[in-house]
Amino acid sequence: MVVGAKGSPTQLILSGIYHLDVPTGNIRLADADALAANPMVKETFPLALGDSFRSFRIVGTNHDYPRHYKVAIAVGTLWENPLEVTLGALVARDLGLTVGDRFIASHGFADGGSAHAQNPYLVTGIFAPSGTVVDRLILTSVQSVWIAHGVSPGTDLAKDDH
């Protein structure tokens, strides 16, 4: 089951699973926490969407997300601290990025969006090619996405357009 903000179910699947459309919006953090605490729910992971780097999407999540897709680390490590990222294999290959590189994200999914220059990301790892959507993603913590937008970690973004 995929849970997200009100809107088109197709758009929710395209944005939340395949990362091919704009997100439908945010749900309240309290609602997400309640769902995760439900004993009938086996697995949840958050997705904080809305930014990119050179057309590759940045996804704020937790370490359960890459485990769900059974992707392995080829070089370096998973992100551990705010503003650290682990790159999908195609992202690293196409952009020529490696562990230790830094980059500035753009707001939105097209090049030229407003940049988050005050919060550069640091590459800490690169996933091995997996044949999954993770190959095309830049993964980081949800807290990193909040920081990039100048929002205090834990703030409810349900009414925000990020």
Where are these regions (language model features)?
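Hydrophobic, regular-secondary-structure patches
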Residues: 1-57, 67, 81
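Hydrophobic secondary-structure segments that place a key small or acidic residue at a functional site
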Residues: 52-62, 71-162
